[in-house]
Amino acid sequence: LLGGVATLNQINQNIFKLEACKWGTKTPFASIRRIVRHTKGIYRIKPGLYALESHRQELEGNGIIVQNEENQDSEIVKTFNHAYYQGLLLEMGKMRHLDTFVPDQDKNKQFLNQSLLGDLRTIQEIPNYSYPQLVKRSSTIDVIWFNERQMPHSFFEVEHSTDIQNSLLKFNDLQDFSARMVIVADEKRHHEFIHKMKYAAFSKLMEDKRVAFLSYESLDKQYTQELEKQQFEFVI
């Protein structure tokens, strides 16, 4: 594994570079997933994210730790989760052949042990897709996907502990764009999201169902499903 830790996507990409690695199956991804789940010496940090036991101490020292009830509200987990899910969204956008952007304020944050978020984004500057004040307003959104015309396809705000209302205010200012708007957070914050969406200031967002809530668990699952789709020559 790269640096002792890797997503299933990274494992999938790198394992075929090994000359001695031969697969007698048409579904190698499923085999890889089964192997990492059941091989001694490999442990799961999150769904779709695995590490070597021999690197556990080093990884934990770098803030890459298994979340539990005791540490879930710690700063180290907050920092790790925010950068990790930004990284997943950047990878998923690229798999869907979209351009991806992460703000400059986050570009030097580490995604696992190998990459910076700035290295994962496909464009280094946000496109001038509209009036300067609107482009500037969107430039701090955690992850943006752009279509082939350099127009916003999806806005994502990752909310581990910060106030969801701040993200909704951004979305409110950008509601005239035909782009998906998504709050990514722990499922336990879903009720808070619904409560904030009912504020009068966001009545238009609520009425038009402009903002979706995506739980970490759902994102993890969709990331894995997106990887599985990559093995097919044609996807319906």
Feature-to-residue mapping (PLM):
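Catalytic cores of nucleic-acid endonucleases
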Residues: 121, 127-141, 147-215
